[in-house]
Amino acid sequence: MPRSPGLFLLLLVLQPLPALGLGLRSAGGRNPECGPCRPERCPEPVRCPVPGIVARDECGCCALCLGAEGASCGGRAGARCGPGLVCASRAAGAAPEGTGLCVCAQRGSVCGSDGRSYPSVCALRLRARQAPRALPGHLHKARDGPCEFAPVVITPPQSVHNVTGAQVYLSCEVRAVPTPVVTWRKVTRSPEGTQVMEELPGDHTNIAVQVQGGPSDHEATAWVLINPLRKEDEGVYQCHSANAVGEAQSHGTVTVVDRSQYRAPRFPAPDDRL
């Protein structure tokens, strides 16, 4: 007796559906391969290089250290980066597993509410995690970019001593935000005895001034070159730097000796040794 088509469809509907391997997590959101959490079976707790950035493993059971900015990452067994960080490859092409570097997803330095500059907002957040939250005015980002500060002389000019006709120079290195304007001045005295600042190079044909940025960000290096050196060039030279926040100065001295005071050494003739 042939089966009725309606009966066949009814039997098909009543058949249990096979489990489909869709790789979905269970209703609880856990990895299907994870068993019951047993903390006693977790690896012994390790002291994380950077405390405060810890997460749970994929099963939500054992604690894992997260990589801070600049830490190695990537690979199957490599470290995971902390919040706000991404694992970037160190090489332009293909690189071995575990050779990535944790970098901040938001590039650029920031100014913190504590008046300090941080290389990235991730570095500021890490500092904020480590700072006591009970203190008033908890650390936060004040603005993008480094904090402003008045010029600071990093390398002051060194005093020089030379003879007339020689070539000498003085240099100084200054750091500030915004980047400072650096000038050279010669400290002189008026006939009345008051101090006078003479801007250089002025009318001096043997003096040149050069200023360039660097060697690091928000730094400036300035030189004053004297060639040829004359007796009237002797004196005190000031390296002056200024920006919208403040100013700073440092001094170097040039001492000049007349070349005519030095005589060429006379070596004894062969006959003089007899």
From Swiss-Prot:
IGF-binding proteins prolong the half-life of IGFs and have been shown to either inhibit or stimulate the growth promoting effects of the IGFs in cell culture. They alter the interaction of IGFs with their cell surface receptors. InterPro entries: Growth_fac_rcpt_cys_sf, Ig-like_dom, Ig-like_dom_sf, Ig-like_fold, Ig_I-set, Ig_sub, Ig_sub2, IGFBP-like. Gene3D superfamilies: 3.30.60.30, 4.10.40.20, Immunoglobulins (2.60.40.10). GO terms for cellular component: collagen-containing extracellular matrix; extracellular space. It holds the Pfam family IGFBP. Residues 91-149 form the Kazal-like domain. Glycans are attached at residue 162. This is Insulin-like growth factor-binding protein-like 1. Its main location: secreted. Residues 30-105 form the IGFBP N-terminal domain. Residues 151-255 form the Ig-like C2-type domain. It is found in: Secreted. GO terms for molecular function: insulin-like growth factor binding. The keyword Nuclease does not apply. Disulfide bonds join 34-59, 37-61, 42-62, 48-65, 73-87, 81-102, 111-147, 172-239.
